[in-house]
Amino acid sequence: MITARQVRAARALLDWTQDTLAEEALVSLTALKRLEDRRELKVHESTRVQVQRALEKAGIVFIATEGGRGVMLVQRPNATVMS
């Protein structure tokens, strides 16, 4: 399960606004704001999945190890990065 911090960090790596990510993920801006909230508000699992897929399509890789969670940007030949 991706975390609010991972989503915010991924968006920063892509230089995307919340509006851009919401549009790419086909979720409402309100749903995305709930997902990114530091208080870890409850969100629909479908929202989480759609956001993760949109970020992965743009080249984000989600990392989860015993040492913690994170993200990294991998440039893919066919990745479309909007700004």
Regions found by a protein language model. Name each.
Residues 28, 38-39, 58:
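The DNA-recognition helices of helix-turn-helix-type DNA-binding domains
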Residues 7-20, 76, 81:
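Short basic helix-loop element that most often maps to the first helix and adjoining turn
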Residues 1, 42-45, 65:
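Non-catalytic, surface-exposed connector residues within folded enzymatic/regulatory domains
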Residues 16-34:
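Short alpha-helical DNA-recognition segment
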